[in-house]
Amino acid sequence: MKKLLLLFMLFSNVTFAQMAITHFNAEWNSANDVLWVMDLEDCKTISYSDIAKDTESQVKHKIAVVPTIIIFKDGEEVARFQADLSFKMIATKEEVQDEINNQMMSDF
């Protein structure tokens, strides 16, 4: 019982990072929306931003090409995936999910 209590006390102070994803694109490039972004796991928030309508967000996050996917950990950018010159996302769902997993595991 003492060991169980000790383990509980050790891990009760562990807090997990809040992971969030923002998918930046524009209406004129909707054919290249990254549809699988909504299937990513272990993210508290997955959001979409149309940079043509939300220019403030475009400037704030320095979006130069769309689509762009940014992973935020506790509100700070930790990874960015951008489209190629043809405005198509080159990263795969697996690559983005691997980065999310790596960020989550870095807390341990």
Which residues make up each language-model segment?
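Non-catalytic, surface beta->alpha helical segment in thiol-disulfide oxidoreductase systems
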Residues: 71-108
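Sec-dependent N-terminal signal peptides
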Residues: 4-13
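Extracytoplasmic/periplasmic, Sec-exported soluble proteins
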Residues: 50, 61, 88-92
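Local sequence-structure signature of Cys/Sec-based thiol-disulfide redox active-site neighborhoods
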Residues: 16-49
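Structural micro-motif
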Residues: 61-72
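N-terminal post-signal-peptidase region of extra-cytosolic proteins
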Residues: 52-57
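Short, flexible, glycine/charge-rich loop motifs used to bind or transfer phosphoryl groups or to couple energy/partner
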Residues: 11, 36, 59-60
